[in-house]
Structures are given as structure tokens and as C-alpha cells.
């Protein structure tokens, strides 16, 4: 992007990560995701050649995400998604990942695209969680009513708050680390929690049904 440095990896960590923190504050404040070109020209590489940034913004986003590690499906995740689909549930994704490429690439590489009837990305809609609009986009695409929806997420302050803001009928958080207590508040408190993604199969036996007796209160074990 027009910068000369003896250690590009270190420069990237020292400069771009710091600038991204400032961008993230803005994004969370306004519940907005900036277009890829704007992200780099306004926040991350404003002192670089603007024309080169414009041409390479999408690739820069993708490579920046790769420095954070490749996203992989959680253990039992693919099998759980396929089984829930077989049981008749309509499923979707609402993602706040930066860049337009990563989610689509992941869905195609893992063969999971056919199992999701809506995929909403803040990098496409420019609306991010917990902003209510992106949840409405998802419901509108599949023709769902909020009272018939359940949101499953691992971030209380984005996933759960947003789902509750649009009156989802149910919210479930994933507590992957049992020994790390959830930081619950009245606003982000989900209806239940699970410790493993496949635990969803115990909760949702059949479309239109919830096994209430299988629900684990979010305070359990805290």
C-alpha cells in the first residue's frame, strides 16, 4: 500500500491493529460496518496511496482477517447444523466479520451453504450487531416472525442483546469454557446456555418444539 518497512509484519501489528481499535470503537458506537474501501482509506491506511488502497481494499480486508486465524467450524458443528435442518428447522447466519469474502468462502469450503436460508453480513448490509436492523433483514428473507425465532450466539453483548431487542422468542448463549463465568446483566441475559454446540439437538427435537426440561439456566454453575 505504499509503505516501506524492514519488518512489514511488525509494522502491521503496531500500526494497523492500533488503528483498527479506533475504528472498532466507532463501529460499536454507531452499530455500523464501514465499506471495505472506506475502512482502509479512512481508518487503517489513510497515509498510504489512496488509489492502491481503493484497488486492493477487499484483499486487504481478507488478509487482515487471516492474520487473526482461520475460522473453523466448532466440534460437531457441521453435523448439528445438518441434523437441525433434517428436523425441519430454518437456519440463518448473522455475522459481524470484517470483509465480504470470509463467510462465503467458509460456507462453500465446508459445504454448509445449502443449510442456511439467510446469511446476513454486516460487511454487506453495513449494519452490525446488536443493531436491530440486521436481525430484521434475516427474518424478512426467510419470512419468519420474531416470536418463532431463537438466536444462538457466544457474545452476550452483541448476539443476545440484539436478538432481545427485536423480541426473539428465545436466546441461547454458548459457554465454551465452563470455568469462565458469564458476565450477565439484565440486558444481555439469555434464556438458556449450552456448553457444546451439539447440545442444541437436545433442546430442539422437532420443528416447532422446545425441550424446556433440557434448558440450562445461564446462571447455572456461576
Model-derived features: where do they sit?
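N-terminal helical cap/lid subdomain that shapes the substrate entry/recognition surface
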Residues: 1-75, 79-82, 86-87
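Asp-based, Mg2+/Mn2+-dependent phosphohydrolase catalytic module
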Residues: 78, 82-83, 90, 94-222
